[in-house]
Regions:
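Histidine-acidic metal/acid-base catalytic patches
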Residues: 1-33, 57, 94-97, 104-105, ...
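N-terminal small/glycine-rich loop or linker at the start of catalytic domains
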Residues: 2-14, 65-77, 112-115
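Conserved beta-strand positions in the central sheet of alpha/beta enzyme cores
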Residues: 38, 65, 108-109, 146, ...
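Glycine-rich, proline-tolerant flexible connector loops at the mouths of alpha/beta enzymes
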Residues: 38-58, 118, 155
Length: 284
């Protein structure tokens, strides 16, 4: 066992508190001593987005990452429309152009989406090409883009890739420093060769997300860090050793289950999540 505080700032994704409004997220996160927020664009009113984003800094928070309204290149279960690749890329570009000034240096998180014919190789080629093009937009606006490999339960539904190494193959294929990795422990903790993959990622890790695992009973069944099977402390140590010094973001989805965390005290979820991460770090 080692001593010392968890070396990452504490962040919460707005997906964790889906029942709350954007304004409630900001004010309540600040009151709960959350350091930084992962903004979910779907919570913003397009007519008031600039006004809403301005209150983040007013409450002493920073933006550690942005989840665009459309964040996959191919259509997905969560965001099926528009179907056109060009339209989806245009929407992603628009998200960067609108929100980057409120999130300097932060990554915009994307994943591949589901290739219409299940062609993983083509999906990786297309996403590599489109990310390389979007890197110019990110560079012009002072932000980055983080590609997230999803859990195998999402393959051909939300994603064509499910391992850190697959994501890194795409990232490295862009040849651009603005493109990096979103490392979500719930998605990748069962990958073979994970230790080596995290080491390979190194300074390409732009975002880290945490929750915990029980055998899923729905498409969205994540639990509070420390309450499940993921070796969070070990994964945080590997991530730290790879050079990451950013925020550890609690990202929980909890839908279509009898004990949905969305129907519980979400302030308590935020508090318990921080305690779970700190305990996991201290225990390794």
């Amino acid at each position: 066992m080692t001593t010392g505080a968890m070396p990452f700032s504490y962040a919460v994704s707005e997906f964790t508190t889906m029942p709350w409004t954007f304004e409630e997220d900001v004010t309540r996160y600040a009151a709960l001593c959350v350091d930084t927020i992962e903004v979910c664009e779907q919570k913003l009113d397009p007519a008031r987005a600039a006004e809403q984003m301005a209150i983040v800094a007013e409450h002493g928070l920073t933006v550690c990452a942005v989840q665009p309204r459309v964040r996959t290149f191919f259509a997905s279960r969560i965001t099926p429309d528009p179907q056109s690749l060009a339209e989806r890329v245009a929407m992603l570009r628009g998200s960067i152009e609108r929100l980057a000034r409120f999130a300097p240096g932060a990554p915009f998180i994307v994943n591949t989406g589901a290739h219409p014919s299940g062609d993983m190789a083509d999906a990786m080629r297309v996403v590599t090409r489109e990310l390389a093009r979007l890197a110019e937009v990110a560079a012009d606006h002072g932000v980055k883009i983080a590609l997230e490999p999803l859990n195998p339960t999402s393959v051909n539904v939300e994603s064509a890739i499910w391992t850190v190494d697959q994501a890194l193959d795409v990232i490295e294929g862009t040849g651009r420093g603005e493109i990096g990795l979103c490392l979500d422990y719930w998605n990748i903790w069962q990958n073979e060769g994970l230790d080596a993959a995290i080491a390979r990622a190194g300074d390409r890790i732009l975002s880290v997300q945490a929750s915990d695992w029980r055998r899923p009973r729905s498409f969205a069944d994540r639990i509070v860090p420390g309450d499940g099977a993921i070796p969070l402390g070990r994964l945080m140590r590997l991530t730290h050793a790879a050079g990451f010094r950013g925020a550890c973001t609690v990202e929980i989805f909890s839908l279509d289950v009898a004990d949905s965390l969305y129907e519980s005290d979400l302030g308590d979820v935020i508090t318990r999540s921080r305690a779970g991460l700190e305990a996991a770090w201290a225990a390794t």
